[in-house]
Every structure is written in structure tokens, then in C-alpha cells.
Amino acid sequence: GLSKTADLANPDGPVHFYPGVAYPASKTAVNTVTVQYAKAFPGIKINAVDPGYTATDLNGGTGTQTAEQGAQIIVKMAQAGPDGPTGGYFDVNGPVAW
């Protein structure tokens, strides 16, 4: 996706030619803030999630999944227990490298 440096840098990837700067930069900033907050508040589980391209009013319903499907990773990470991850970036398939 647009938050993954590897995807933006890969000339064979689907987002390599995305012309914008602000959106992918903001996603990278969110990941950095997530890591820094997780270090600053070790007693709290702080993670970022990618719900995927979800059909909403914001995108005119063009997303490839329902809001309920997009919410799955959000709910999962909100329910992470004391031994759960912190400072990471996750989608429904698990940790996402950025």
C-alpha cells in the first residue's frame, strides 16, 4: 500500500507511480508516531492498523470489502492482551513491514 516504502520504491509494484507525496508521507509519519508512543508508554499497547480498502461514503462505496470486514483488525488489536504486540503496524493478515 501507500504506507509501505518498499511498495512505493518497487517499479513493478501497483503503487510505484502514485503521484502524491502527502498521503504516503502521512502514513509513514503515523507509523513513526506509533513506535515512539509505544516506547514512551510501555504500559499501554499502541499499534497502527490498516483496515484495507473498505467501501465507505468517503470513496463512493468503491472499496473491495465491507466496513465490518475492515473493522476486524481494529477490533482484534483493541482486544490485544497484556502480552500482545505494541509499536507495530498490522493488517488482517498480521504485521505489515513498512
Give, region by region, the residue ranges found by the protein language model.
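Catalytic loop of short-chain dehydrogenase/reductase
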Residues: 1-42
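C-terminal helical subdomain
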Residues: 28-32, 39-40, 44, 48-51, ...
